[in-house]
Amino acid sequence: MDRVVLMLSVLSLGVSSQPITDGQRLFSIAVSRVQHLHLLAQRLFSDFESSLQTEEQRQLNKIFLQDFCNSDYIISPIDKHETQRSSVLKLLSISYRLVESWEFPSRSLAGGSAPRNQISPKLSELKTGIHLLIRANEDGAELFPDSSALQLAPYGDYYHSPGTDESLRRTYELLACFKKDMHKVETYLTVAKCRLSPEANCTL
């Protein structure tokens, strides 16, 4: 009798934990994908910087520090403490918007090398994965209640051929912002994934 009770308890535990296991699996895939994109962004940015003269690097970095990425208009946690206080759904929604904001600009990153041509399809896969996670966690909440007010312009003016200096600035800004945003998404998804493990330490 005791053995039967034990077996039923184990089966019951397995059934009750299944949704969490599925959620963790989806999160693991999403985190793995954004980690790959973040590493790719770091490599592309580093390669571009290496191709510049020292003075060009200094000037471009100075300009970038005074400028903003288009995605800065997406409201997101201002520091690690606010990130840790944010709900899973909020972190997922912000991540979705950040990834979505790169659907058009990522086309300008393509070409020249195989890694660059991987960016757009991998962003699309990541966006789909995050959307699945949102649907699994929204629990009746309205999806992106203020998204209609969010209209991000493309990075730079891609309808005119820029001069050499402008082209360098534009490429630098594009790669730097892409790296910055993929780092944000990686952080948000990692924290959200950690929330599925009640005993885990999600400190950044």
UniProtKB/Swiss-Prot annotation:
Swiss-Prot/TrEMBL GO biological process terms: animal organ development; growth hormone receptor signaling pathway; positive regulation of growth; positive regulation of receptor signaling pathway via JAK-STAT; response to nutrient levels
A cellular component annotation (GO) from this entry: extracellular space
Modification type Pyrrolidone carboxylic acid: residues: 18
Domain of life of the native organism: Eukaryota
SUPFAM superfamilies given in the database record: 4-helical cytokines
Binding-site positions, Zn(2+): 36, 186
Keyword Disulfide bond annotated: yes
Keyword entries, A-Z: Disulfide bond, Hormone, Metal-binding, Pyrrolidone carboxylic acid, Secreted, Signal, Zinc
Signal peptide interval: 1-17
Subcellular location: Secreted
KW Lyase (keyword) present: no
Classification via Gene3D superfamilies: 1.20.1250.10
Molecular-function annotations in GO: growth hormone activity; growth hormone receptor binding; metal ion binding
PROSITE patterns recorded: SOMATOTROPIN_1, SOMATOTROPIN_2
Family: Belongs to the somatotropin/prolactin family.
Protein name per UniProt: Somatotropin
Organism annotation: Acanthopagrus butcheri (Australian black bream)
Gene: gh
